[in-house]
Each structure stands twice: as C-alpha cells, then as structure tokens.
Amino acid sequence: MQPPIRENMLRERTVRLQYGSRVEAVYVLGTQLWTDVYSAAPAGAKTFSLKHSEGVKVEVVRDGEAEEVVTNGKQRWALSPSSTLRLSMAQASTEASSDKVTVNYYEEEGSAPIDQAGLFLTAIEISLDVDADRDGEVEKNNPKKASWTWGPEGQGAILLVNCDRDTPWLPKEDCSDEKVYSKQDLQDMSQMILRTKGPDRLPAGYEIVLYISMSDSDKVGVFYVENPFFGQRYIHILGRQKLYHVVKYTGGSAELLFFVEGLCFPDESFSGLVSIHVSLLEYMAEGIPLTPIFTDTVMFRIAPWIMTPNILPPVSVFVCCMKDNYLFLKEVKNLVEKTNCELKVCFQYMNRGDRWIQDEIEFGYIEAPHKGFPVVLDSPRDGNLKDFPIKQLLGPDFGYVTREPLFETVTSLDSFGNLEVSPPVTVNGKEYPLGRILIGSSFPLSGGRRMTKVVRDFLQAQQVQAPVELYSDWLTVGHVDEFMTFIPIPGKKEFRLLMASTSACYQLFREKQKAGHGEAVMFKGLGGMSSKRITINKILSNESLTQENQYFQRCLDWNRDILKRELALTEKDIIDLPALFKMDENHQARAFFPNMVNMIVLDKDLGIPKPFGPQVEEECCLETHVRGLLEPLGLACTFIDDISAYHKFLGEVHCGTNVRRKPFTFKWWHMVP
C-alpha cells in the first residue's frame, strides 16, 4: 500500500451520483459533500425532487444561492447545469449507511419520477489532536493545530528531541533507537491523540492511515502503547524507515494515544517544523491506489537548544581535579559553599589530564509545555575530556548533542570558552528575551581562524538567541571569555558588561606612579614567575609593551563597538577591568598577569583570577581597584590563585570551570524571533 500523496486539508469533496443506482459514501464531520444532480440525470429529465433522512442537512445551490431542503420531497426544482447539492451532517452515525438522500427525476409535466439516484451516508468523526495551545494538555480539534506561530498568542505543538538516556545501560541517547524501555522515556515525548466516533464498523473499502513525509522521517518518531491494561508494549509505528501506519478502526467513541519524539535539533537544512497526518482512504478496486477522502494534519516545532547567561542562578559548578591544582580546587570549593549550588569534581580517571572543562562543553536546556531538561552541547574540540559529557552527564533527564565538522579543521576557536550568551536585551525595538549568543571569529578579510561552520549553523538555526560574531583571533587562544563577561546586579533586573581594558590598566598604573608608588612590585611572593623584579615603572617605561597594548586596546574597542551596537549597550552599561597582554611570535595576545575578566559568576559571588598586581601599602592595587568598581553594585569579589595551575597554560578561572544554570522562566515560544 502506498501512503497518500495529497497532504492538503480535504474539507470539501465531490461525490458523483448515477441515476438508477445507489452510491455509498463516508462523510467526515466538519466537512461538506457536493454532488451534481444535473450530470447524474437520465435523458429527458427536466425537474427533480429530494428526500433525505433527518440527520442530513441538504441545500440546493443554484448560481451561488443556497436554499435548504425540507425532508418531505414535495418541492421540485428545474434541472440546470448550475444545480448542485451541498450536504452536511452534525452527528456521527450509529450504523453504517443508515442516512439516505434520494433524488427523483421527472419529465416536464409528469407526476411519477422517471428514475432516481440514491446516496447512502455513514457519518464519522476523525480528529488528530495535540497540545496546540501549549498548556500541557491535548485539547480537542484545535482549529490552529496544522500550523505554528510564535509569540504569547501563538499556537502549535512543541516536541523535545529525546536526547537524554533514561535507560542507564544503553550506549547512546534515547532517540538513537526505535525502542522504549520505560515510562520515563515516554514522559520526554509529546502526546498525540487520534479521536474517532462512528458505527461499530465502517463500510467495506475504507481505512485510516497515519503518515509522515519522507523529509520528516529522520526527524520524528511515533510510538503506540499496545495493551494498556495487560502489561504495556511500546510499538514504534512511524519514523526512519516507517512512513505510514494503518490504524485499526474500533467503532463507537475511541481515543488512541500516541507518543511523539523529536530525533534531531533544528539545523541549517531543517527549520524545526514537522507534520503528522491522518487520512481516511477509500478503496475502489484491486490494483487501483487508495484515494484520500479526508486528511487531518498536526504540526510540531522541535524545541531549540537554549544557552543560559551568567545572570541566571547557578545549579552546579564543574571543575577538574589535577595533579597540580589542589589549592585552586580548595578555593573554588570555598567559593561554591557561599552559594546554594553544588560542586561537581571531574576526577583524573575521567579528565585524563585535561583541565579545560569550559572548552569541552556548553550547558543549555530544552523545554516544552509538559517538560524540560538540561542538554549539554559537546564541542568538536575533543580533548582528553571528550568522554566526560557522554559518560558523566548524559542520563535520565540530561540530554546530549554535538556537531562535528566533516572536512574543516578544528581550531582553538571551536572550544566553548569561545561561546557565550548575553543577558536579555532589546535592540532598536527588537526584543531578545533569551539574550544573544556571542562567538569569537577572525577579523574580516584576514583569513584567520573562525568557529567551524557546522557549529555556527547549529547555533543560528535555534532561532531564539540570534548569534553575534565578535573578533577574538587577535588572542593566542582566541576565546571571547578572555576579554568579556556579564555580571548580574543583585536585586535588579540589570546587568553590566565587563571588558578587559589595557588603557584602564595603564591609567591606573600612571596614577599609582604619580602618587609615588612607581617601585611597587608585581608577582610578589611568586618564585617561579620570573627572577626579574617587575615594577610599575618598568612596565610604563617599556615602549614595545606599551605599543603592543595600544594595538590590543584597538582590538578590544572593535569588539566594544560591536557589542554596543548588537546588544544596544551604552558606556554606562560597561565596566572596564584592567588587563595587560604581551605579544607572542604570531603577533597574538596572551595575558601578562592573570586576566580578571575570565571569572566565574555565581549570582552575587564572583571568583576572579588573582592578578598579583603591584603591591601598594601591602595590598594589590588591581584587586583594590576592581573591588571599588564591583562591590558598590552589591557583588562579592573572591580572588582565586590560578597562576601556576591555569594562567601559565594560557587560561584562567573561567576556562577551568563550568556552570550549569537554571533555565529562563520566560518560555521561548512566547518570543518572536
């Protein structure tokens, strides 16, 4: 059997009558049947009369004018090419072919009919239903279920990619096979109900079929629960190789429950929309294809993967345990204890010597009206932490997704220190209630490094956090988290953008020099850094360092301008944190002292790389300066020593930690991208 090809909503259809015979037809409630009395008439017929059952509403339509027909059959109408009948019924039949319409044909003056045509009708109700109004419940026959619209008044059902693993002994995500092992797995799916009502059995030659298009078959899967009362079996009926499924008509009032899962996220070649159809098919004769006489369609949008900005409350902090980071680990633990989140340590057997947990993964989430759960995006970087997301994170209600390039080379810019997201912003009247994704790229026309296209396409295709490309290729490592971060302002809905600034550093050092602290020493008490005494005077008198940092400030300002434009920020939204960089052999920047902007943000508690700046009156003047900027906003600054375990390997606190946060309370389907 071929699945039906026509997918339009067949709400009106034509039935052909023939004088001297009776035609049987199935009528679906909510549709209209048209029949042409003129072409069905015998030769010599000039007028016709009508008789019909109480349950059928019959109208004679001539030249666009409709006239309702009483049941007694006394009235006559002149036959003309424009004479048609419009039939409808309001209730499902209790028996097959129990409702009738009879057309009697007459000659000019004759009182007895010369012939007649009969139509025997069976009325049934068919409705494929989903949660189109997004309240978590499947409603009945929502008129907008076949389309999908954004916004607070929007309609259309939502589907989750079933990318978690509810069965611990399976190697991959639940959506990777066609089996269901538990009720928990069904809870990740969206419900769909096929409602039918009618006589105990349909007339011979009719069947009901559920089907999907070939292009949707790798994006959606449908399951049916067999024997709900005698130990359930979950049968996979649609998706992958299965394009259609014949539904057994049970008679009376019936509701068949199906479970629908998403198989893949929106991407460059997939908008995220999938449709499922039910058709009533009519059989004519052996060897002739079945024809659809009624189709009902529902549409789902697959929920996008959503990133969580720093302003959202933290749930868990992840950090790697290394041979050399015991003190760092202890300081992070102390910081986390001040907040209400948990510390999760990735031990050496799992990290295999890879400390950069920020670079391997990005935490996000997916959500539908009935359910939501966190989903980790695995970077194509694939360092020694590459098994961590699948082995330690993927599990019940914790999903996994990745994008790997086939032919492109993976660079440092594909690490997820180079993937951040802003808090919610409004730009020129356009709202971004979930913020905007920020990724680092190369300078236009420079032919430098860029994040791989498959990841950029994936982020763009999610639609709800329109990405902004920044310029990060001027840095040796090339990550956006090396020059910017966002902090919440406690108790307010506001935030600030923190940016690394070499000019702020030079300005601070000149002020200290002017106040007589030119001999203040940096990196005090650190044996391994350098045998040279590095003072404010030495830094300010180093011409090449000054020139390099003027260039780096231009790179920072280029990004500042993009961020101001794309996030609608003003200067008062930005706080400059002093930073210094030195140029490597490729003319790219690496931090001269621990880069304070590369911090971990846990509500009001900030874990900031300890800069080991010049000691003025027994205090680091950089720490004092930063406290003076941030503490008046209600933030608490904790400076963490990362110099030997992270800074010397070209990363800081943010690079070595990762935070899973609570999802937005705002529902993504309420926005208009």
From Swiss-Prot:
Binding-site list for Ca(2+) 3: D164, D166, D188, D397
N-acetylmethionine: modified positions: M1
Cofactors (names): Ca(2+)
Cellular component terms (Gene Ontology): cytoplasm; euchromatin
Binding site for Ca(2+) 2: N162, D164, D166, D174, D185, D188
Note accompanying the cofactor annotation: Binding of Ca(2+) triggers a conformation change that is essential for catalytic activity.
Tissue specificity of this protein: Expressed in various tissues including muscle, uterus, spinal cord, salivary gland and pancreas.
Catalysed conversion reaction: L-arginyl-[protein] + H2O = L-citrullyl-[protein] + NH4(+)
Keyword Calcium set for record: yes
EC number(s) on file: 3.5.3.15
Pfam short name (any one): PAD
Enzyme's top EC category: hydrolase
Binding locations of Ca(2+) 4: D174, D177, K179
Active site residues according to the UniProt entry: C655
Annotated positions binding Ca(2+) 1: D131, D133, D135, E139
BP-aspect Gene Ontology terms: cellular response to leukemia inhibitory factor; estrogen receptor signaling pathway; negative regulation of chemokine-mediated signaling pathway; negative regulation of lymphocyte chemotaxis; transcription initiation-coupled chromatin remodeling
Sites of Citrulline modification: R352
Its biological purpose: Catalyzes the deimination of arginine residues of proteins.
Assembly description: Homodimer.
Protein name, UniProt field: Protein-arginine deiminase type-2
Organism: Mus musculus (Mouse)
